[in-house]
C-alpha cells in the first residue's frame, strides 16, 4: 500500500445497520427488492430509449446517461451490504474502502452535473422552443455528459488525494454499511480538522452550486410555463414535476450529508440508505410513472415482444 509506516490498518470493520438478526433478515429482503428493481428499471429505461425512435431526443439521451449512473451507483456498496447481512464480522480492505469512496463521489458528482444539464435542456425546450433543435444538438449533449463525468472524477480525486495517505493506526470501525468519507477521516491518527474543512468546502461547493443552479433554472422555467397557454403547458408541467421531484429527493439527503458531514446522529446511517440505495430507484419510478412518452414506449416494446412470442 502507498501510505506511511504509521498506517497499520489493512482493513476496516463495517458495523452495518443493526446487530439484530431479525432486522438484518428484514433489511436483506427489502433492500434486495429495491436493488433488483433499481437495476432492472434503469436498464429498461436505457433499452427503451435506445430502441424507440420517438425518444431520440436530447432529453432522453441525458436521461439514459442518468440511468447508467444510477446503475453504477446501485452496485458500489449495495451488493456487499446484502452479503454482509449474513456475515458476523463485516470487513473491507483498505483498498476496497478507498475504492468505495472514489466510486461514490464520482457518481454523485456526475449525477449533480447531469441534473443541471437536464434542467438546461428543459429551459431551452420551454423558454426557447424555436431554437431548441439548433442549440440542443448531439454535440452539445455529448459535451454535457463528458463534463459531468469529468467533474465527478475530479471531485472524487480531490477527496481521495488527501485521504489515501492518512495514518490509520486504529481504531478501524466504521459505523455504517459502507466507507463513508467523513467517518473514515475521523479514524485517522492525527488532527483531522483541516481535512474536515477541506471535505466540507469541496462537497459543499459542488452540491450547493448545483442545487442553486437547478432552483433558479426551474423557477424561470415554471414562470415560462405559466405564461403559456394551458393547452400547451400540461405536458411540459408534467415533465417538470418529474424533474423537480428527482432534484428534491436527490439533493435533500445529499446536502444534509455534505453540509454537515461531521455532525453525526444515530439516524444518519438510515438516511444514508436512502441516499445510496434508494436514490437510484427514483429515476425509473418517477420518469416511467410521470412521463407519458416513456410509458407509451414501454407498452410498445411489451406489445412487440408479446406479438413475436405469439408468432
Curated annotation (Swiss-Prot):
GO MF entry, a single one? G protein-coupled receptor activity
Question: What spans does the record annotate as topological domain Cytoplasmic, numbered to this chain?
Answer: 50-57, 121-139, 220-235, 290-311
In the UniProt record, what gene is named as encoding this protein?
OR4K1
Origin species, per record, is Homo sapiens
Give the protein's function.
Odorant receptor.
Q: What is this protein called?
A: Olfactory receptor 4K1
Swiss-Prot/TrEMBL keywords: Cell membrane, Disulfide bond, G-protein coupled receptor, Glycoprotein, Membrane, Olfaction, Receptor, Sensory transduction, Transducer, Transmembrane, Transmembrane helix
**Cysteine-cysteine disulfides:** 97-189
Identify the InterPro entries for this entry. GPCR_Rhodpsn (IPR000276), GPCR_Rhodpsn_7TM (IPR017452), Olfact_rcpt (IPR000725), Olfactory_Receptors (IPR050427)
Amino acid at each position: 500500500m502507498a501510505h506511511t509506516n504509521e498506517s497499520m490498518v489493512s482493513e476496516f470493520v463495517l458495523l452495518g445497520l443493526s446487530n439484530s438478526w431479525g432486522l438484518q433478515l428484514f433489511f436483506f429482503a427489502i433492500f434486495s427488492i429495491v436493488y433488483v428493481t433499481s437495476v432492472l428499471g434503469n436498464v429498461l429505461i436505457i433499452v427503451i430509449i435506445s430502441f424507440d425512435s420517438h425518444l431520440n431526443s436530447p432529453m432522453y439521451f441525458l436521461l439514459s446517461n442518468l440511468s447508467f449512473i444510477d446503475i453504477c451507483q446501485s452496485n458500489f456498496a449495495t451488493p456487499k451490504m446484502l452479503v454482509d447481512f449474513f456475515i458476523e464480522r463485516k470487513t473491507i480492505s483498505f483498498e476496497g474502502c478507498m475504492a468505495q469512496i472514489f466510486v461514490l463521489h464520482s457518481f454523485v458528482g456526475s449525477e449533480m452535473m447531469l441534473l443541471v444539464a437536464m434542467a438546461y435542456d428543459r429551459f431551452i425546450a420551454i423558454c426557447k422552443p424555436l431554437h431548441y433543435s439548433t442549440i440542443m444538438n448531439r454535440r452539445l449533449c455529448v459535451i454535457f455528459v463528458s463534463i459531468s463525468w469529468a467533474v465527478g472524477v475530479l471531485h472524487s480525486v480531490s477527496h481521495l488525494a488527501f485521504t489515501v495517505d492518512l495514518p490509520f493506526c486504529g481504531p478501524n470501525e466504521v459505523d455504517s454499511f459502507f466507507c463513508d468519507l467523513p467517518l473514515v477521516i475521523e479514524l485517522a491518527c492525527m488532527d483531522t480538522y483541516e481535512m474536515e474543512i477541506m471535505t466540507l468546502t469541496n462537497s459543499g461547493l459542488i452540491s450547493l452550486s448545483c442545487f442553486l443552479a437547478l432552483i433558479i433554472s426551474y423557477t424561470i422555467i415554471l414562470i415560462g410555463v405559466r405564461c403559456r397557454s394551458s393547452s400547451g403547458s400540461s405536458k411540459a408541467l408534467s415533465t417538470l414535476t418529474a424533474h423537480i421531484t428527482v432534484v428534491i429527493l436527490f439533493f435533500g439527503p445529499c446536502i444534509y450529508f455534505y453540509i454537515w458531514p461531521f455532525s453525526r446522529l444515530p439516524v444518519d446511517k438510515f438516511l444514508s440508505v436512502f441516499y445510496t440505495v434508494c436514490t437510484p430507484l427514483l429515476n425509473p419510478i418517477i420518469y416511467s410513472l410521470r412521463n407519458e412518452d416513456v410509458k407509451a414506449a414501454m407498452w410498445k416494446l411489451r406489445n412487440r415482444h408479446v406479438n413475436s412470442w405469439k408468432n
